[in-house]
C-alpha cells in the first residue's frame, strides 16, 4: 500500500542544470489496498546549500538548548526524510494558480477555500507564504484536477496516470517543478473522509490530502512518525495537524528561522518558557528550539576498502546485485549511498529490491553505493561501487 512517485523528465528554470534533469516528484497519496485494509475495522545556510551543495551530508545539528525537551530528544530517532538531493525552493513567498477544478461536488469557490486552508497549515508554522494568482499568470505551484490520462502521463514512463475512484488520490512534484495533481474521479469534500451510502462513493477530504501534497511540493518526503501529516498513511489514520516532525524537516531543509522581528525581545522576556507553543511556531531560532536528530534511521556505514569504480554515460540504467548467494543464510541486505542509508524506492530515480539496486545514471545519482548483508549483528558480506557519469 505504498505510494508511487512521479518524476518530470524535463525541468525548466533549473538550478544546477545537470541534476535537475532528475527532479524527483512528490510521492502519491493512498493506494486502494490501503483503503480496503482500513475499511476492515469500521535561512541563512539553506540558501548557500541550495545554490550547489547537492551532496551535503545528512548530519544532525547541535545538542538542543531547551532542558524541558532534552529527555525526549536524546532518545528519539530522526523520522522525517528529505529528497536525496535535498531539493528545495530558493524563496519563501510562493504563488500558486489553479488550472482546473473538480467536476464532482465542490464548486470553484469551495475548492479555493479548501486549498487556502491547506496552505495555511504550512504558512502558520513556517516562513512560507502562499498567494493565489490568475491561471494565465506564471506561478511557483500549479494545481489541477485531472482525469486518468492527464498532461504527459501516457508518453512518460516517469509520470504515471491516475487510476480512477478510490485508488491514488493525488500526486505532487518536488521543487522546483511545483505541480500538484488531484484525481478528478474522486468525490472531493470539505470535511472528513467518509463513505456516502446515499451516493455509493467515498467522499475525500480535500484539505487533508492537499496539505500532505503541499508538504511534498515543499521538498518533504514521507515521515516514519505515526502521527505525522507526512506519514505514508496519514489520511487513513486521520492525523490532520502538522507535527513537530514536519517542522524539524523544514528546519533541516530551509534553515531554522524566526517568523517575526520581535522574537529576540520576546525571548528576553521569558516567553520561550511560558509560551512554548507560540514560540515554537513563531520564534524557533531565538528560543533554541531548532534541533536536528543526529541519529539516522538505519546506522551509517563506511565503504569497503575495495570499491569498484564505474564510468557510465548519462541516462543509462544500472543495476547492482548484492549477496544473492548468501541470502539463504537469512541475512538482510542494507543499501547506502555515500554512507547514508537508502530506505525507499523512488520510481524513475532509484529502485530497491531484496538483493539488487537499480538507478538511472545522472548527476544526482553520482556517488558511492554500498550494500551490507547482515545476519543479526554479524556482517556476512559487503560490496561497494562508485558511480561517475561521463559528460
UniProtKB/Swiss-Prot annotation:
Entry EC number(s): 3.4.24.-
Sequence ranges on the Cytoplasmic membrane side: 1-19
Species whose genome carries this gene: Rattus norvegicus (Rat)
Membrane topology of the entry: Single-pass type II membrane protein
Binding site for Zn(2+): 212, 216, 222
Domain Ig-like C2-type: 296-381
Subcellular location: Membrane; Endoplasmic reticulum membrane
Function: Protease. May regulate the surface expression of some potassium channels by retaining them in the endoplasmic reticulum.
Residue stretch(es) of the prosequence: 1-79
Keywords on record: Cleavage on pair of basic residues, Disulfide bond, Endoplasmic reticulum, Glycoprotein, Hydrolase, Immunoglobulin domain, Membrane, Metal-binding, Metalloprotease, Protease, Signal-anchor, Transmembrane, Transmembrane helix, Zinc, Zymogen
Full protein name: Matrix metalloproteinase-23
Active site: 213
GO MF entries: metalloendopeptidase activity; zinc ion binding
InterPro entries, alphabetized: Ig-like_dom, Ig-like_dom_sf, Ig-like_fold, M10A_MMP, MetalloPept_cat_dom_sf, Pept_M10_metallopeptidase, Pept_M10A, Peptidase_Metallo
Primary subcellular site in the record, as a coarse category: membrane
Tissue-by-tissue expression: Expressed at the highest levels in ovary and uterus. In ovary expression is strictly confined to granulosa cells of preantral and small antral follicles. Detected also in testis and prostate.
Cysteines engaged in disulfide bonds, as pairs: 256-290, 263-283, 272-287, 322-371
Highest taxon in the source lineage: Eukaryota
Amino acid at each position: 500500500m505504498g505510494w508511487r512517485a512521479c518524476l518530470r523528465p524535463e525541468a525548466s528554470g533549473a538550478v544546477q542544470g545537470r541534476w535537475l534533469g532528475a527532479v524527483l516528484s512528490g510521492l502519491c497519496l493512498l493506494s486502494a489496498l490501503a483503503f480496503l485494509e482500513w475499511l476492515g475495522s469500521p535561512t541563512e545556510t539553506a540558501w548557500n546549500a541550495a545554490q550547489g551543495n547537492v551532496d551535503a551530508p545528512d548530519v544532525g545539528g547541535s545538542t538542543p538548548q531547551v532542558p524541558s525537551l532534552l529527555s525526549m530528544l536524546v532518545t528519539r530517532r530522526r523520522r522525517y526524510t528529505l529528497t536525496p538531493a535535498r531539493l528545495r525552493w530558493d524563496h519563501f513567498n510562493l504563488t500558486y494558480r489553479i488550472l482546473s477544478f473538480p467536476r464532482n461536488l465542490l464548486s470553484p469557490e469551495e475548492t479555493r477555500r479548501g486549498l487556502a486552508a491547506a496552505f495555511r497549515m504550512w504558512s502558520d508554522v513556517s516562513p512560507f507564504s502562499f498567494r493565489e494568482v490568475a491561471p494565465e499568470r506564471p506561478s511557483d505551484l500549479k494545481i489541477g484536477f485531472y482525469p486518468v490520462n492527464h498532461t504527459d502521463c501516457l508518453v512518460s514512463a516517469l509520470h504515471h496516470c491516475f487510476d480512477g475512484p478510490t485508488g491514488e488520490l493525488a500526486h505532487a512534484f518536488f521543487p522546483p517543478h511545483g505541480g500538484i495533481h488531484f484525481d478528478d474521479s474522486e468525490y472531493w469534500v470539505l470535511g472528513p473522509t467518509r463513505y456516502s451510502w446515499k451516493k455509493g462513493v467515498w467522499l475525500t477530504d480535500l484539505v487533508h490530502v492537499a496539505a500532505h501534497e503541499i508538504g511534498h511540493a515543499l521538498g518533504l518526503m514521507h515521515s516514519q512518525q505515526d502521527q505525522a501529516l507526512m506519514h505514508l498513511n496519514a489520511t487513513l489514520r486521520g492525523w490532520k495537524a502538522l507535527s513537530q516532525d514536519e517542522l524539524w524537516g523544514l528546519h533541516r531543509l530551509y534553515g531554522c528561522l524566526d517568523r517575526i522581528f520581535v522574537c529576540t525581545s520576546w525571548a528576553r522576556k521569558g516567553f520561550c518558557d511560558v509560551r512554548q507553543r507560540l514560540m515554537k511556531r513563531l520564534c524557533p531560532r531565538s528560543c533554541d528550539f531548532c534541533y536536528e536528530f543526529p541519529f539516522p534511521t538505519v546506522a551509517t556505514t563506511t565503504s569497503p576498502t575495495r570499491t569498484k569504480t564505474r564510468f557510465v554515460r548519462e541516462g543509462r540504467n544500472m543495476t547492482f546485485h548484492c549477496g544473492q548467494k548468501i541470502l539463504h543464510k537469512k541475512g538482510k541486505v542494507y543499501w547506502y549511498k555515500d554512507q547514508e542509508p537508502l530506505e525507499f524506492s523512488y520510481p524513475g530515480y532509484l529502485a530497491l529490491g531484496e538483493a539488487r539496486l537499480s538507478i538511472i545514471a545522472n548527476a544526482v545519482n553520482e556517488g558511492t553505493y554500498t550494500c551490507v548483508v547482515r545476519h543479526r549483528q554479524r556482517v556476512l558480506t559487503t560490496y561497494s561501487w562508485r558511480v561517475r557519469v561521463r559528460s
